Amino acid sequence: MKNNQEYILVVDIGNSYTKIGIFEKEKENTTSIILFPTDSETNIATLSKKMNVFKKYNIKHSIVGSVVPKLKPTYFKTIKKMFNIEPYYISETTKYSFLIDESPNKELGDDLKALCEYCVSVNKNCIGISFGTAIASVYLKNNSLVGASIAAGLGFGLNKLIEKASLLKKSKIDKFSSDFFGTNTISALESGINNLRSGFAYNFYNQAKKDNLNSDLKCIITGGESYNINISSFEYEINKEAILLGFKKIYFLNN
């Protein structure tokens, strides 16, 4: 056992990747975190090996968010077996620090609800943008969810393009490139990735700002692809763990 400090285990199961982190109950920085590809056929034995790194911590709380519903029972059983606690799951009766209408409450993914929760902890007027398998954004006005926008992710689109273009199949694309203008096919693709990231954030922010001209609108950017965002027209915060933190906040709001 690491110490007597209580920890919360937070699980975010995405379509492509699963991220698991632990936090001290009273802190917002992750103590330990693991990331691995989501496997719809995973089992208790496999998960137990992955999460064994957390056994040394005094884990007394847990929340599991998932956009892959079939995996929830496996995670429930694994966490209960390893830590002797029952994880909390988001449901239609879950309370939030923001207002959400009935329809989006039923349809919006757990991860985006967690992003909303983190956003309103920063400011009552806020947009959150997640760059991952999908590009997703949420807009909150006066602590109320106005709406969201979802598009195919950069990695998915790039992989499909490389599959179709024979000249690109042996080329290495640097998704971390910050160049705005490409001088050949590869650097042009790298420029496109950079401009798509920054352009999506810029446009979504501006549309929200038009709807809320007199507010101090904040912008939170997160997700595995949230790097090299080049925007000078407004301030933004990049927090890779915003969604995990949102789940943590949801847990303690409901328990």
Swiss-Prot record:
One of its GO terms (biological process) is coenzyme A biosynthetic process. The keyword Mitochondrion does not apply. GO terms for molecular function: ATP binding; pantothenate kinase activity. Its cofactor is NH4(+); K(+). A monovalent cation. Ammonium or potassium. GO terms for cellular component: cytoplasm. SUPFAM superfamilies: Actin-like ATPase domain. This is Type III pantothenate kinase. It comes from Malacoplasma penetrans (strain HF-2). The gene is coaX.
